């Protein structure tokens, strides 16, 4: 899972991130990695056609929505959201965080072994399944188990 700071929760900001990823990875790699995107019904995802179509109006992904109040439809994302809330408790302002801070947080979260993955971390599994250029692009680094921090101390300045 990746996370990005947005200027606001608008479709245009999410589209700009999708476009940037597609430009960097190429349309084929983008479509291979993100063949579908499962999301909630937040306003930033309200225009699926804008997100599904990329460079030269080619379809790059398919957007699917979870039903309202059905977090069980994307349990692995919800586990990551729990970890995010451990590091950034509800009410925490993201104004003082940089994208580098968010990427560091996601490196720690993605390095955390999961029982649902047979004891592997999401990042280890991603390294087995995705081209290295994809992992490198997102700037995620594997954190040794004994150095993983999933508390607010991770981002204290």
Where are these regions (language model features)?
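Short small-residue beta-strand/loop micro-motif enriched in glycine and branched aliphatics
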Residues: 1-4, 65, 90
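Active-site beta-loop-alpha junctions of metal-dependent nucleic acid enzymes
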Residues: 2-28
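Structured core elements
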Residues: 3-5, 38, 118
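Acidic/histidine-rich, metal-coordinating catalytic segments
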Residues: 28-47, 67-69
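RNase H-like two-metal-ion nuclease catalytic core shared by retroviral integrases
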Residues: 39-41, 51, 63-87, 95-107
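Short, surface-exposed basic-aromatic patches at helix termini and helix-loop junctions that form
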Residues: 49-61
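C-terminal domain-tail junction helix/linker
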Residues: 90-157
């Amino acid at each position: 899972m990746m996370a990005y700071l947005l200027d606001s929760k608008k479709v245009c900001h999410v589209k700009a991130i999708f476009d940037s990823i597609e430009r960097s990875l190429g349309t084929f790699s983008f479509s291979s990695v993100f063949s579908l995107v499962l999301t909630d019904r937040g306003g930033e995802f309200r225009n699926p056609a804008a997100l599904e179509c990329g460079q030269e109006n080619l379809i790059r992904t398919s957007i699917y929505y979870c039903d309202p109040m059905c977090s069980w439809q994307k349990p692995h994302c919800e586990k990551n959201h729990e970890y995010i809330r451990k590091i950034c408790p509800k009410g925490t302002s993201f104004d003082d965080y940089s994208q580098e801070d968010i990427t560091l947080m996601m490196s720690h979260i993605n390095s955390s072994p999961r029982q649902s993955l047979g004891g592997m971390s999401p990042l280890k599994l991603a390294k087995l399944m995705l081209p290295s250029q994809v992992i490198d692009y997102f700037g995620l680094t594997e954190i040794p188990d004994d150095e993983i921090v999933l508390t607010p101390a991770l981002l204290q300045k």
